[in-house]
Design a protein with these regions (language model features):
Chain C
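Conserved loop-alpha-helix segment in the C-terminal half of the alpha/beta-hydrolase fold
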Residues: 313-348
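Active-site loop/oxyanion-hole signature of alpha/beta-hydrolase fold enzymes
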Residues: 118, 162-203, 207, 362
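Catalytic histidine-centered segment of alpha/beta-hydrolase-like enzymes
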Residues: 348-361
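Conserved HGGG/HGGXW glycine-rich cap/lid loop of the alpha/beta-hydrolase fold
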Residues: 127-171
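Mobile cofactor-carrier "swinging-arm" domains
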Residues: 1-114, 118, 123
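Conserved alpha/beta-hydrolase catalytic His-Asp/Glu region
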Residues: 249-311
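Short beta-to-alpha linker loops that shape the active-site pocket of alpha/beta-hydrolase fold enzymes
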Residues: 45, 165-170, 175, 232, ...
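Flexible "cap/lid" loop of the alpha/beta hydrolase fold
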Residues: 213-217, 224-255
Length: 324, 338, 373
């Protein structure tokens, strides 16, 4: 498997990011229960290999556009975890000054064009970023994260067509976690997702989203294709979704057995640990050390978010326009 | 100074700005004139000929015909704006913004606020609006109140060739998303337009005509009818100010209030439907902030609360005209408190 | 036309005027009118101004009443001596050929401004009249040829009169990058060559006065006379409020406030006038060009060019100043050498050629005649 040719540093980085996402989401879930997080969140736990497997190929000048379930993409693209946590707590130190919340975390300086509250929101934006790269003659690519819900949106269909006719350097990363809110994708998605790309003459791949290395390899090919000017790729990435649609979702549309099996059999983190230790690329002690560091970082992020000030009331009316 | 058509004024603005800034691009349906066909290049230059000649001057990378998928290309324009370009997207009819409204009011309009002030979205969306061409309900609306309602958007409605050019250049140079609406009946109207580039600032009403008896507020094509009404009334000894706000967001409240206070009578003409329209909005501002100066109730002359009809007699009855405006002014002037 | 009976007609102020509104009669029927007496107020889209009677006599009949609009050239009233009978007045009105106005007929052969290439410069020039020693009219900072709306026609009765837009003003391109008065003067001299002007009467207002002085400094042989109206360049004081305010104003309200400083009585200003100045200032390149000129004209609120020594009495010079000038004080006309004629006009601000047009026209006409004689 080619992913195993990654350097130790890259492997450690991938593991750290995946672990960071998992711990971040588990902690947000716990903090939600405490009642101190004012808004709603949609947790990415279980899907970490997808975000990290793709974003590891990207530099800061590459762009991604994300979904309502965006924390994982943000962390994988390099957003500041303290700022993200503060944002979710609605604080002035938040990455969006407390104005966006979980669903609108963005950091343009990191090439993160925003989580998005609208299903199917990302594909047109990612096409736009790719258009910028193409017109300005840059080598940057962009990634539209969407899901088995978003694949049915008109925006996604329109964007895939536009990307293909204009040969835009964009990757449509369709994270299929099996559910659009509470409705199973098997109930609402007709046909095969990859066939939608095939019909447009677009390159595609279907990958196991629990396997970091599989995602990383498929994404690598897609990114290289885009950088070569050969246009877009659709990646159909099958992942689990550990939590319900939103934090606090009783998730009673799935059986307890199904959920337990999912967490037992489809977890990207132990699978990654097993693979790298069996191949003797990293030691368990190194991985455990990362776990401890990540835990400390998240503890710190929560502590600083809790103690941070609320936004000033005067900021209610600022930053609507550059100039009005 | 040279006389130019409204269409030519817009075309010059696009030429100026594409020359001035390589980040300016134009995209939309048939803006490059109809690509991929066997006949002449740049045959259409946009559905209304506004983008004619851009393809030849700036090439197919910066002047792009799109699929008929407004969500994709307006959304892409928003994404491109956020990442460094200055896209000018053309939507043939403002009515079609219905199929990509999410891209405008959930995405482009809100990037800056949602992202804590870090995003800049210099996007222009040009579209035609207005009744009078027998185009019926889905190609004739005056939807600017809808966009005016959305924080984060700027909304521009030029009434003259001079304003069309200066406001479009301002829109392209502006760092916020701008909805730029062109009344299709005005494309062949002619007026003085400088050859060089210039800007007309947003939020600055134009005093088209000065008179002490009443203020007629009008936008876009209605400015012409308001002038016509003012001429009719002048012959009767009623002197009207005609005020063209030029942009509904930002709105030049200061000048509206100043003129309302100076004349004490206000008639607002709006081609849009009456409920939650610009006439209603402006009248509420004046009623709230200049009530003491009013000598008569604020009069509204608007389209009825109906879709735009097709039959010529019905359409003519739908659109406000000089006669209805003059009648409203006379009524205001004749008003006596009992 | 007999001197016993004379027509008062709608004046034509500038090329674009086709009609005017009779805003008010300043004398009633039966009043005796002296030549030069203010007789009526006329309003156009651009400006409102009083009109002085050219002739004298009794105001026998008002033909166009207050509030009515009439085309350029239309008969507005009749002046006649006492001995003219009412029936003769009626006959005069009935037969007045131009009663309907001449604007429509004149539209085609009206003089048109042209763009004149002069070296690297492209000047807008409007020329009227012919013969004599030509006069060149040079407007002030931020102005244009429209400054001379009430003057060019009268001055062109017996000579060619060229109204020019300075570089970066009106319809002339911003070809003087430095903004230095001396460079502007050199550009105007290049225009002289392009127009085949050997020698001219220079009539300059404000900054245009300084430009005229700068031309006289380097090329006295090209200057028949100087008529300087509230000129810059002969004293230190200048209103920084005006210059800075003019540079800063981007919108109607602040621009209106700034422009009102120009006039003793700003009532004659209207929205169109303010709009036209804003239109000029919005052109790409103009704000920078104006700032460059201002930067060479003044520093720390004082004028920094001193051309006062040019007024040494060798070149015939007339200085006209409004007593109520709020931009450059009229006191700067004190203490000039003998041989420099000074006229200070009460009731005028920085724009006497507009506010007291007839008086300024008389002064300049007399001065030019004297300078040629």
């Amino acid at each position: 498997m080619t992913g195993l040719q990654l350097s130790r540093e890259e492997l450690l980085k991938a593991y750290r990011l995946m672990r960071m996402i998992r711990v971040f989401e588990d902690r947000v879930s716990a903090e939600m229960a405490s009642g101190d997080i004012p808004g709603n969140t949609h947790l990415y736990a279980g899907q970490e290999a997808s975000a990290v497997g793709i974003c590891l190929h990207l530099s800061e000048s590459d762009r991604i556009a994300s979904t309502h379930r965006g924390h994982g993409h943000c962390i994988a693209k390099g957003c500041d975890v303290d700022g993200m946590m503060a944002e979710i707590f609605g604080k002035d130190t938040g990455i969006c000054r407390g104005k966006g919340g979980s669903m609108h975390i963005a950091d343009l300086s990191k090439g993160m064009l925003g989580a998005n509250g609208i299903v199917g929101g990302a594909p047109p934006i990612a096409c736009g970023a790719a258009l910028t790269s193409q017109i300005l003659g840059r080598n940057d690519v962009s990634v539209a994260f969407t899901g088995d819900g978003g694949i049915n949106q008109g925006t996604t269909a329109e964007s895939m067509n536009l990307a293909q006719v204009w040969k835009l350097p964009v990757i449509f990363a369709v994270e299929d976690n099996g559910f659009g809110e509470a409705t199973a994708s098997s109930f609402v998605v007709a046909g095969e997702i990859t066939k939608r790309a095939e019909a447009l003459g677009m390159a595609f791949a279907k990958v196991d989203g629990v396997d970091f290395f599989a995602v990383h390899e498929a994404a690598g090919e897609a990114v290289e294709r885009a950088r070569r000017g050969e246009g877009p790729t659709l990646l159909h990435i099958e992942t689990p979704r550990y939590y319900g649609h939103f934090s606090g979702d009783p998730d009673n549309y799935r059986t307890a057995e199904e959920k337990a099996a999912m967490r037992r059999d489809r977890d990207c983190l132990p699978r990654f640990r097993r693979r790298v230790t069996e191949a003797k690329l990293l030691g368990l002690d190194e991985l455990d050390k990362v776990d401890a560091e990540v835990q400390a970082a998240i503890d710190q992020a929560v502590a600083s978010a809790r103690s941070a000030p609320q936004p000033a009331l005067s900021s209610l009316t600022t930053d609507v326009y550059v100039r009005y | 100074m040279a006389q130019k058509s409204f269409r030519q004024a817009l075309n010059e603005a696009l030429h100026h700005e594409m020359r001035r800034d390589p980040n300016v691009i134009v995209l939309g349906e048939d803006v490059a004139g109809g690509s991929g066909a066997s006949g002449q290049k740049d045959a259409w230059g946009g559905a209304f000929g506004v983008t004619k000649g851009l393809l030849g001057a700036f090439g197919p990378s910066r002047v792009r015909d799109t699929p008929i998928t407004e969500s994709a290309f307006v959304g892409a324009a928003a994404g491109a704006a956020m990442t460094g370009l200055r896209p000018v997207a053309e939507i043939m009819f403002v009515d079609f913004l219905g199929v990509c409204f999410d891209q405008i009011f959930n995405q482009a309009a809100k990037f800056r606020y949602m992202f804590g002030g870090k995003a800049v979205t210099p996007l222009v969306i040009r579209a035609t609006y207005g009744a009078g061409t027998r185009s019926a309900s889905q190609h004739s609306q005056a939807l600017y109140p809808i966009f005016t309602h959305v924080p984060g958007l700027k909304v521009v409605i030029p009434s003259s060739p001079y304003d069309a050019k200066g406001l479009l250049i301002q829109a392209i140079r502006d760092n916020d998303p701008v909805i730029f609406l062109e009344n299709k009946v005005l494309y062949d109207t002619v007026g003085e337009v400088p050859d060089g580039a210039y800007t007309v600032p947003f939020g600055e009403a134009h005093i088209v005509r000065e008179g002490g008896d009443a203020t007629i507020v009008a936008l876009g094509r209605m400015v012409h009818f308001a002038r016509e009404a003012a001429e009719i009334l002048a012959a009767e000894g009623i002197d009207c100010t005609v005020l063209d706000p030029r942009t509904t967001s930002p709105l030049d409240e200061d000048t509206l209030l100043e003129m309302a206070e100076e004349t004490g009578r206000v008639v607002i003409v709006d081609e849009a439907n009456p409920r939650c329209g610009m006439a209603a909005d402006i009248s509420s501002i004046i009623a709230e902030k200049a009530f003491g100066a009013l000598k008569a109730p604020i009069m509204k002359v608007t389209a009825p609360h109906t879709p735009v009809p097709y039959a010529p007699n019905l359409e003519a009855a739908y659109i406000p005209d000089a006669k209805r405006i003059a009648d409203a002014v006379r009524k205001a002037v004749a008003f006596k408190r009992s | 036309m007999s001197d016993r009976i004379q027509a008062i007609t709608m004046p034509k102020w500038g090329m674009t005027m086709t009609e005017g509104k009779l805003a008010g009669w300043l004398a009633g029927e039966g009043a005796d009118i002296a030549a030069g007496q203010e007789i009526m107020e006329v309003e156009t889209e651009k400006i409102t101004n009083v009109v002085e009677s050219q002739g004298q006599g009794r105001l026998r009949r008002i033909v166009v009443s207050e509030g009515a609009t009439a085309p350029v050239g239309a008969l507005l009233a009749v002046l006649a001596t006492e001995d003219v009978s009412d029936s003769d007045v009626e006959a005069f009105i009935a037969s007045y050929a131009d009663r309907a106005g001449s604007a429509a007929a004149d539209a085609d052969d009206a003089p048109k401004a042209r763009i004149v290439q002069a070296g690297a410069h492209r000047f807008k020039v409007l020329s009227l009249g012919s013969g004599g020693v030509p006069a060149v009219l040079i407007h002030g900072f931020g102005g244009d040829g429209g400054t001379w709306l009430f003057n060019q026609d009268t001055l062109a009765q017996n000579r060619a009169v060229h109204v020019i837009d300075l570089p970066a003003h009106g319809d002339s391109e911003p070809t003087v990058a430095s903004g230095k008065v001396t460079d502007i003067a050199d550009a105007v001299l290049e225009l002289f060559a392009a127009l085949d002007i050997e020698k001219a009467h220079l009539i300059g207002h404000s900054l245009g006065g300084a430009v005229a002085l700068a031309i006289a400094e380097t090329s006295p042989q090209r200057v028949q006379s100087l008529s300087l109206i509230a000129p810059a360049g002969i004293g230190a004081e200048i209103s920084a409020n005006y210059i800075d305010g003019f540079l800063a104003a981007e919108r109607r309200k602040p621009m209106k406030d700034v422009l009102s400083l120009l006039f003793a009585d700003p009532q004659g200003m209207n929205a169109e006038m303010v709009e036209n100045v804003l239109r000029f200032k919005r052109l790409d390149g103009v704000p920078e060009a104006l700032a460059a000129i201002a930067g060479h004209l003044m520093a720390d609120g004082k004028q920094i060019i001193d051309l006062r020594a040019i007024l040494d009495g060798k070149i015939p010079a007339l200085i006209v100043w409004g007593e109520a000038d709020q931009i450059i004080p009229a006191s700067q006309s004190d203490g000039l050498p003998a041989g420099v004629d000074v006229a200070r006009l009460a009731g005028a601000g920085h724009m006497p050629m507009m506010e007291e047009a007839a008086q300024v026209n008389r002064l300049i006409t007399a001065h030019l005649g004297k300078a040629e004689g």
